[in-house]
């Protein structure tokens, strides 16, 4: 497993319109090879949005970074200050706490 956390702020779009965009994009993400799950994030108090991506492995994440879906989101004019943090998973303690492995 490999974890990626992406955060950004909304620019010139309402949270309601953004939520509609997420609803429309969700089926496309469900079909991404190697993406085990995506958790969609929103904190309207801080204006921070994003997602936690659980990848089969780092290669799956890197393959996704070359897709049209990734590029359309990464360059979207209404997403500002996009950051990405990537992590390996520590399998031992993750299993103890019932995390996905």
Report the location of each language-model feature.
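Short S/T/G/P-rich N-terminal loop/turn motif that feeds into the first structured element of a domain
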Residues: 1-48, 58-66, 77-101
